[in-house]
Amino acid sequence: MSDTTTAENTNEPRLITETGLDRRVADIIEPVLVDMGFRLVRVRMSGQNGLTLQVMTERNDGTMTVEDCEEVSKAISPVLDVEDPIDKAYHLEVSSPGIDRPMVRRSDFIRWQGHLVKCETSVMVDGRKRFRGKIVSVDEDGFRLERDQPAYGEEAAVAIPFTALSEARLILTDELIRDALTADKKAKAARAANENFEDEDTDNE
């Protein structure tokens, strides 16, 4: 797994975005999230428990706490009430991407290089649209995948352009859980240290 800096992640555009009503909601709430120091991962309307608006987000450092979810919910709820993009009663659900997260930005592929991912493309790539394997390298235009179960006659490695990507998600493994928990712990420790430093500066003024 590779580290990426907060600066590199700030305002980085998503490779995979919504359509229709989901896109309208995303356009409304994303500026609010950015101002708060969060990144939008995904918006999805679901018929679960009536009608549920699922908003997946994270801090620029990749962390997300229960308190963060509550903060985001309180911030975007009144904005959605004013803009009123949904003409039915719905339940707002804010969550983190989770360990087996959707991969929606180039930095996601860089950060989780070496881990297993499953993805779909909007066009045929190397004779198929569905892939599963390890991310072995990432460049400006796409990533290289080493298939863990190549079909007979297929090369194990395949290059997938970001422009062809329609969906991608990490596959849960023991290695992913270990690395994700380690990264989360480091990021939260760094944030706490930074907040303590800022508090000391304020006290000295």
Curated annotation (Swiss-Prot):
Primary location recorded for the protein, binned into one broad class: cytoplasm
Keyword field: Cytoplasm, Ribosome biogenesis
GO biological process: ribosomal small subunit assembly; translation
Localization of this protein: Cytoplasm
TM annotation in the entry: none
Known role: Required for maturation of 30S ribosomal subunits.
PANTHER family in the cross-refs: RIBOSOME MATURATION FACTOR RIMP (PTHR33867:SF1)
Family statement drawn from the similarity comment of this UniProt entry: Belongs to the RimP family.
Gene Ontology cellular-component terms listed: cytosol
Pfam family, one: RimP_N
Name of the protein described by the UniProt record: Ribosome maturation factor RimP
